[in-house]
Curated annotation (Swiss-Prot):
GO biological process, any: positive regulation of ERK1 and ERK2 cascade
Family: Belongs to the arrestin family.
Protein name (record): Arrestin red cell isoform 3
Protein location: Cytoplasm
Organism: Oncorhynchus mykiss
C-alpha cells in the first residue's frame, strides 16, 4: 500500500490567503494546429467573497523596456492578448465540460471551488525572456503569459496585489516529429588577379538539434586560387526578430571556434568542427533570448520558433532562429586587395528545441465523477492525502520554480 505517486497539482494563494488558484501544469504546448487548454480551479473564502464575483484573466504581454523606467504613465509594455473569465457566478454561455483534473479538484475542495477555462490563440508567441544585464532591475524584457485571479463587483474595479493571485505560465513548442532535410550550402569565389576560384562547401549532420547537443559542422574547401586561407571561424548565432511596432533583428554568437587551419593555393581541405551552444557560457550577454523566466533551474537558450502564419507580425512578439556561420579568412595581397577582396562565408540554418516529452498531460472532459466521498478540509493542501482513491490522490506544490544553485532568489513573486 504505501508508495503510490499522486497527481501533481500546482497552487498559489493571494498574499491575504483568501484566494487560491490550482493548475495541473505550468507549461502549455503549442502543437501548431491547437494549443493545450488552460483549465484550472479557483478556491475562494466565502466570508471574503460576500456579494462579489470571481474573475480570472489571461494576459499575453510583451515587455520591451525596463520596469524601473515606467514613469509618467508611460509603460514599456504591450498587451498582445487579454481574455477574462467569470468563474462565479458562472455564465451559462462560457461553461464547458470540466476536465478530469478539474472534477477531481472540485470534489476535493468543495463548494467554494470554481473551474475556469482559457483557449490560447495559435498565433500568439511562445514565452521568451531577454537576458538582462548585471545592472538591470525589475522584470526582464520578453514575452510572458500571466494568469490573474481576484474577487470584485466588476472587472473594471481596481484590485490590490494583496487581494489577487498572479502567476506566470509558459507557452512552449517542442521539436517536430519529422525534421527537415540536412542543411548544406556551397559557394564559389573568384579573386582579383586570379583566373581560378576557391570553392567552399559546408554541411551539418542534421537539421534538428536538442538543447545541449553538440553540432557537427563539416567543412570542405577546394582552393584553386592563388590566395591562402589563413584560418577558419565557425560560430553558432542566435537571431531574434523583435516584432513590435516595426521588425528589428538582433544577432548574438552563442558558440564559436577559431582554428588556425590553413589552406594553401592549389590544395584541398576537409575537417569536422564541433560546437555546443549552451546558456552556461553566455550568461553575461545582455539581450540574449532565453526560454521562459530567468533565474530558474530549467532556463536555457530560447528554442527555435516555428510559425504557421506570419500575416499579423504585431502579435508574434519574438521570433528566434539559429544559424551556423562558416568563415574563411583570406590572405591579403596587393594595394587593392583589402578593398576589393573579402573573406568567404556561408550560413547554415538549423532548429534548436526540446524533444517532445514521452507523456504529456492531457485535459479530458469528464461528464460524471462519483460524489460519495465528502470534500476534505481545504486547509490540508500541502500534503498527499492518506486516501488511496484515485480521485483523492494529489500532491500539491507551490507555484514557484526551483532556483539555480548559488544564485539569489528572484524577488518577483509572480512566478
Amino acid at each position: 500500500m504505501g508508495d503510490k505517486a499522486g497527481t501533481r497539482v500546482f497552487k498559489k494563494s493571494s498574499p491575504n490567503c483568501k484566494v487560491t488558484v490550482y493548475l495541473g501544469k505550468r507549461d502549455f504546448v503549442d502543437h501548431l494546429d491547437q494549443v493545450d487548454p488552460v483549465d484550472g480551479v479557483i478556491l475562494v473564502d466565502p466570508e471574503y467573497l460576500k456579494d462579489r464575483k470571481v474573475f480570472v484573466t489571461l494576459t499575453c504581454a510583451f515587455r520591451y523596456g525596463r520596469e524601473d523606467l515606467d514613469v509618467l504613465g508611460l509603460s514599456f509594455r504591450k498587451d498582445l492578448y487579454i481574455s477574462t473569465f467569470q468563474a462565479f457566478p458562472p455564465i451559462a454561455e462560457e461553461r464547458k465540460a470540466n476536465s478530469r483534473l478539474q472534477e477531481r479538484l472540485l470534489k476535493k475542495l468543495g463548494q467554494q471551488a470554481h473551474p475556469f477555462y482559457f483557449t490560447i490563440p495559435q498565433n500568439l508567441p511562445c514565452s521568451v525572456t531577454l537576458q538582462p544585464g548585471p545592472e538591470d532591475t525589475g522584470k526582464a524584457c520578453g514575452v510572458d503569459f500571466e494568469i490573474r485571479a481576484f474577487c470584485a463587483k466588476s472587472i473594471e474595479e481596481k484590485i490590490h496585489k494583496r487581494n489577487s493571485v498572479r502567476l506566470v505560465i509558459r507557452k512552449v513548442q517542442y521539436a517536430p516529429e519529422k525534421p527537415g532535410p540536412q542543411p548544406m550550402v556551397e559557394t564559389t569565389r573568384s579573386f582579383l588577379m586570379s583566373d581560378r576560384s576557391l570553392h567552399l562547401e559546408a554541411s551539418l549532420d542534421k537539421e534538428l538539434y536538442y538543447h545541449g547537443e553538440p553540432i557537427s559542422v563539416n567543412v570542405h574547401v577546394t582552393n584553386n586560387s592563388t590566395k591562402t586561407v589563413k584560418r577558419l571561424k565557425i560560430s553558432v548565432r542566435q537571431y531574434a526578430d523583435i516584432c513590435l511596432f516595426s521588425t528589428a533583428q538582433y544577432k548574438c554568437p552563442v558558440a564559436q571556434v577559431e582554428a588556425d587551419d590553413q589552406v594553401s593555393s592549389s590544395s584541398t581541405f576537409c575537417k569536422v568542427y564541433t560546437l555546443t551552444p549552451t546558456l552556461d557560457k553566455n550568461r553575461e550577454k545582455r539581450g540574449l533570448a532565453l526560454d521562459g523566466k530567468l533565474k530558474h533551474e530549467d532556463t536555457n537558450l530560447a528554442s527555435s520558433t516555428i510559425v504557421k502564419d506570419v500575416t499579423n507580425k504585431e502579435v508574434l512578439g519574438i521570433l528566434v532562429s539559429y544559424r551556423v556561420k562558416v568563415k574563411l579568412v583570406i590572405s591579403r595581397g596587393g594595394l587593392l586587395s583589402g578593398v576589393l577582396e573579402r573573406d568567404v562565408s556561408v550560413e547554415l540554418p538549423f532548429v534548436l528545441m526540446h524533444p517532445k516529452p514521452t507523456e504529456l498531460p492531457i485535459s479530458r472532459p469528464q461528464s460524471a465523477v462519483p460524489d460519495s466521498d465528502p470534500p476534505i478540509d481545504t486547509n490540508l493542501i500541502e500534503f498527499e492525502t492518506n486516501s488511496f482513491s484515485q480521485d483523492d490522490d494529489f500532491v500539491f506544490e507551490d507555484f514557484a520554480r526551483l532556483r539555480l544553485k548559488g544564485m539569489a532568489d528572484d524577488k518577483d513573486d509572480d512566478c
